């Protein structure tokens, strides 16, 4: 069967840069889906995307759809005809479903069967529908119309190229008749570009100053930006999302170095970087010490004969934005940071939970409580908590919301606050996402935990629990943040007590009944997914969860110990024994004696197990006190032999009540040793 390369390119007005990659990948996926559904084989597929075009190249596409046959089974023959041989409604309905007369149905077998051979169609006749369906299925939140046309797309369409080998596919899609005429660069080559063949697509456009391959443009921008930064004795900040966006804005990238006045460096560099990246799409430069240089890199979409004009234009555009940041910074510093707290009394945190000022006061007290328990400075934590939301009322954060916390840090330093207090104002928002940076200071950790617990308790306390994908107060992220800080920074904090403190701080604003348990359950539930991502089995998590440890650090240490225990050869047998013991003890009527009495032993294996348990108990007590859970479980693994011997030789439910009760007590001691770490009966 013959094969030809296939190219489709849809030309448009400038596409949304942040959506370009998504649109391109969806376009490719849609065409691939259509080709597979039609049974059309090909060798490779590639998507191209630029500001004014989406294109897909399919190599070695079969030019003819293969023939196929269909076989449909109908009702059983006895159900298809009555006693007189007349067709029933079942038979007639099957024929109607197949679109044929009953006489065309095969009636020779046990069931009615309809068979049909379908000749394959030329690929050229199938491609218009495949392309059109793919475009219609693109993830476009809001489509637009243009002119007097009824067609809708993300942007007005301008041209359409569709080639199968040298053949133009005759069709009209989104108001554009297919041909082989594309367009070059809007300024360097505004006239049409003839695409000779699908394989010459990239070369034909390159000659017209268009790099259709987004990966090629991205590589050029990245490499050239790095070279220019090195010449400036700096390092470029190139966030992946910004690089993708800039790549989607240009067809012929030309990075250029621009500069701004050094006086702007007195403004917090985070504000300057934010405005240059978010508003102007510039790559900022840092020196060897991580300080902002008074230079930046812009990526032009034109190879100018006089690049200095482009440089001057960008410098002129950025100056007012930097001037605004400078003005806000100077205005805010005219008063102490704490003075902004008064404004927060009129800013609602949550209608039922009071103002942001109220929240800051609660966070201050809770942060001091937490700091005292994790080895931090309680007075610093209290101060940082009180100032934690002040910068929300500043001009700087009003203009640059991303500066919350960062602005507070600079203003606190300006006011002479201790550095740990200033740092905590920024660290309170950490971690800002999955895998993001954690607070470096204990003061920051205390405020961050306090802020998150206050939000969790408050929102839970008024019944606004997250449901499904809806989590307007980011409670899941808050819970994960608390856990990450405590576990990864090795901070031992009893969350039972901390949550209770937070509940009391709200007073009558929340429904306290059951609130502690609900919040703690929600927090520790987040660990399940965390451990699954780390390859820790659910059973391991549940074995520790059954004990309800209040410390996230302690919880994690137990989980790691159980995970290591499961790799021991004795683990499976001991887990099974624990499950057996748990079942036995759960069926005991009345209470199990707390003391084991040797006088009721009538089997040597009872003495052996009792002795082994006593020795193990003495060994693991100091280990448990030191939270050496790995060592504790490793020592308990040695109980397998006496445990197996006991169950092989001893009937637990003896007829003598005293002997039976004593054996229950012995097994309860055994189970209690393991419960010092986890309920390993759940590992089966």
Curated annotation (Swiss-Prot):
Enzyme Commission number, as recorded: 6.1.1.14
Subcellular location: Cytoplasm
Pfam family, one: tRNA_synt_2f
Superkingdom classification of source: Bacteria
InterPro entries documented for this protein: DALR_anticod-bd, Gly-tRNA-synth_bsu, Gly-tRNA-synth_heterodimer
Keywords linked to the UniProt accession: Aminoacyl-tRNA synthetase, ATP-binding, Cytoplasm, Ligase, Nucleotide-binding, Protein biosynthesis
GO annotations of cellular component type: cytosol
Chief localisation class: cytoplasm
GO biological process terms held by the UniProt record: arginyl-tRNA aminoacylation; glycyl-tRNA aminoacylation
Reactions catalysed according to its record: tRNA(Gly) + glycine + ATP = glycyl-tRNA(Gly) + AMP + diphosphate
GO molecular function: arginine-tRNA ligase activity; ATP binding; glycine-tRNA ligase activity
PANTHER family with a match to the protein in the record: GLYCINE--TRNA LIGASE, CHLOROPLASTIC_MITOCHONDRIAL 2 (PTHR30075:SF2), GLYCYL-TRNA SYNTHETASE (PTHR30075)
Family, per entry: Belongs to the class-II aminoacyl-tRNA synthetase family.
Subunit structure: Tetramer of two alpha and two beta subunits.
UniProt-recorded name of the protein: Glycine--tRNA ligase beta subunit
Native organism: Pseudomonas fluorescens (strain Pf0-1)
Taxonomic lineage of the native organism: Bacteria, Pseudomonadati, Pseudomonadota, Gammaproteobacteria, Pseudomonadales
Gene expressing this chain: glyS
